[in-house]
């Protein structure tokens, strides 16, 4: 009897152990692993998955589900596994509500993104590493053909503390939209970044999900963009160097038009048209074809294209002479880059190098063109999110070197604006002066006469202004709705707290007066809300807790971009929140922003 009892006791222990083993297996495999990766699709890479497809031909599906190894979560990419589905409706990559905030974690990531990167990292992470962008080329570009013997390209991307998702979207756009036989390599130069995800995680990602032609070089100390690009170029072995910023997305057929011009003349440097990626919404939009210029403060500026450069049967697709380049995106024969003296290594970090190389190209026998059929999108930030390592004014230092080497007597134009800099140190320029002599370069007067005759000169060398530009002015956006912005529950209207013409003024709820034109809002195709046809409803992108204000319409979307969504909510695109009445029982009628929840405090209608 005792042996039977012991035997059944042992059976019970074995059964219990097996049961617990199965339960623990289910718990750990389906709770701890699957749950954080719930947005990883079974095939390919959906809009929310942290792991994109492996290197597959475009429009094909990727591998099966990836569970191991998981990348470590950290402060800069902790949204990569976040569920961003709207409770009411799934959000696609093209959704205007892709930046919607659902919880405090979303809000923290959005605010951190603006602080660290000066753009909306919440949306950037949700977009993933692959997305289609609109083909913004002129229709005539789409029928053009290019030689079959184009040179190969080394794409050099220098980055410092870049957002992980933005950097990888840059790289994937190049891989996805560049013929493999033309893309010799992509060289990523890490300029001693501080963020953890740009070190081991980036290396592991590249090894697992990108072709072997993608390489990373790591600077041991901060060198800056200028010397960082020189380091990348020194490692390159392709026939052409293509420099890109680390927050770009190349468009279709972007590389062939650049390479074709360089094949024809290796001493020609070419730039794509730089399309706009909004820092607030990451929406990709077309830019007009303009050319580079500068002012006597030695700052780059965009100019309209002279009438003389717009003629000809191929005017929509023909290369456009540009006195200067913006500097972030350009292509150049690698041997010519070295022969021409690369960059001035005495310049620090960033600033002025684009004008210096532009002057050197033109004055020393080369040419600089913008190619209308090549388009690359670039995130245009309103500020630089980081400074120089020791806080030095590198723009001034670099501009002084530029002025003393290349401007000849015209450097006095610069010093007339900055007399305080005449005695400021700028380092040893003897090598650059010797380079100019060795290359047999023209004078700066030759440059002004032959390349940039539109540039105005003050003093005894002043010239008459040449009215050679066409400026038709901006097209006014089409009006979609006109009426009063009515709050459904309080039966009141949103109006200016003071005068509707007061810039920076607050808005609040008051009794609707259908005879008062200052209560009338216009909603146009640019998604702007304009009160009394004067000022736009605007939100601070960096301080989402601030109330909305009336500001001058800037036409750039972002802080002034509003959409009417389901449940009558009024959604602010760059902030990712909805307009609400702060306290519906309070007679003061204050309004603010809050996480969109469809509550009665967030219900609005624009009606006549």
UniProtKB/Swiss-Prot annotation:
The modification Phosphoserine is found at residue 95. Its cofactor is Mn(2+). GO terms for cellular component: Golgi apparatus; Golgi membrane. Its EC number is 2.4.1.41. Substrate binds at residues 191, 222, 246, 350, 381, 386. Residues 30-608 are lumenal. The chain crosses the membrane at residues 7-29. Gene3D superfamilies: 2.80.10.50, Spore Coat Polysaccharide Biosynthesis Protein SpsA, Chain A. Pathway: Protein modification; protein glycosylation. Residues 150-261 are annotated as: Catalytic subdomain A. InterPro entries: GalNAc-T, Glyco_trans_2-like, Nucleotide-diphossugar_trans, Ricin_B-like_lectins, Ricin_B_lectin. Disulfide bonds join 141-373, 364-441, 493-512, 536-553, 578-596. Residues 319-381 are annotated as: Catalytic subdomain B. Residues 476-607 form the Ricin B-type lectin domain. SMART domains: RICIN. Keywords: Disulfide bond, Glycoprotein, Glycosyltransferase, Golgi apparatus, Lectin, Manganese, Membrane, Metal-binding, Notch signaling pathway, Phosphoprotein, Signal-anchor, Transferase, Transmembrane, Transmembrane helix. This is Polypeptide N-acetylgalactosaminyltransferase 11. It comes from Rattus norvegicus. The gene is Galnt11.
């Amino acid at each position: 009897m005792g042996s039977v009892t012991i035997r059944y006791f042992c059976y019970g222990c074995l059964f219990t152990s097996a049961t617990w083993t199965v339960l623990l297996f289910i718990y750990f495999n389906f709770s701890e692993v699957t749950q954080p990766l719930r947005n990883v699709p079974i095939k390919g890479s959906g809009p929310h998955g942290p792991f994109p497809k492996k290197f597959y031909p475009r429009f094909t599906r990727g591998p099966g589900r990836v569970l191991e190894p998981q990348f470590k979560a950290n402060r800069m990419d902790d949204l990569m596994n976040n569920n961003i589905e709207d409770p009411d409706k799934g959000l696609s990559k093209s959704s205007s509500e892709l930046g919607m905030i659902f919880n405090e974690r979303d809000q923290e990531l959005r605010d951190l993104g603006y602080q660290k990167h000066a753009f909306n990292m919440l949306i950037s992470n949700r977009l993933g590493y692959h997305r289609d962008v609109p083909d913004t080329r002129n229709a005539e570009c789409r029928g053009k053909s290019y030689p079959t013997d184009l040179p190969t390209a080394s794409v050099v991307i220098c980055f410092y503390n870049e957002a992980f998702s933005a950097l990888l979207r840059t790289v994937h756009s190049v891989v996805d939209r560049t013929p493999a036989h033309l893309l010799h390599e992509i060289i990523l130069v890490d300029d001693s970044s501080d963020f953890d995800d740009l070190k081991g995680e980036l290396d592991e990602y590249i090894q697992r999900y990108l072709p072997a032609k993608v390489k990373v070089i790591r600077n041991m100390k901060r060198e800056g963009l200028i010397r960082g690009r020189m380091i990348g170029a020194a490692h390159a072995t392709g026939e052409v160097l293509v420099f890109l910023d680390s927050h770009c997305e190349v468009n279709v057929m972007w590389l062939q038009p650049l390479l074709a011009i360089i094949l024809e003349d290796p001493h020609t440097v070419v730039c794509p048209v730089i399309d706009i990626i909004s820092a607030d919404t990451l929406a990709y939009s077309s830019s007009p074809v303009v050319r580079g210029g500068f002012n006597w403060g030695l700052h780059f500026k965009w100019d309209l294209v002279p009438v003389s450069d717009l003629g000809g049967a191929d005017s929509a697709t023909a290369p456009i002479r540009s006195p200067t380049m913006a500097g972030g995106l350009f292509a150049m024969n690698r041997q010519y880059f070295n022969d021409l003296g690369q960059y001035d290594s005495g310049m620090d970090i960033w600033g002025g190098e684009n004008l210096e190389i532009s002057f050197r190209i033109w004055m020393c026998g080369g040419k600089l063109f913008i190619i209308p059929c090549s388009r690359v999108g670039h995130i245009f930030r309103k500020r630089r999110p980081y400074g120089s390592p020791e806080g030095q004014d590198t723009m001034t230092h670099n501009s002084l070197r530029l002025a003393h080497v290349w401007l000849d007597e015209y450097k006095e134009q610069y010093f007339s604006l900055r007399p305080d800099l005449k005695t400021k140190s700028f380092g040893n320029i003897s090598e650059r002066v010797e380079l100019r002599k060795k290359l047999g370069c023209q004078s700066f007067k030759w440059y002004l006469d032959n390349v940039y005759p539109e540039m105005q000169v003050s003093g005894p060398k002043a010239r008459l202004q040449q009215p050679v530009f066409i400026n038709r002015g901006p097209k006014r956006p089409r009006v979609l709705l006109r009426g009063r912005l009515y709050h459904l529950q309080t039966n009141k209207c949103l109006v200016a707290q003071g005068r509707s013409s007061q810039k920076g003024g607050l808005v609040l709820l008051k009794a609707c007066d259908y005879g008062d034109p200052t209560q009338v809002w216009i909603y146009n195709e640019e998604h702007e809300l304009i009160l009394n046809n004067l000022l736009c409803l605007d939100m601070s992108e960096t301080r989402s807790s601030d109330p909305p204000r009336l500001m001058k319409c800037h036409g750039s979307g972002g802080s002034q971009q509003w959409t009417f969504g389901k449940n009558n909510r009024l959604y602010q695109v760059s902030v990712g929140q909805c307009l609400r009445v702060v306290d519906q029982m309070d007679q003061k009628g204050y309004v603010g922003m809050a996480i969109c929840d469809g509550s009665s405090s967030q219900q609005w209608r624009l009606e006549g």
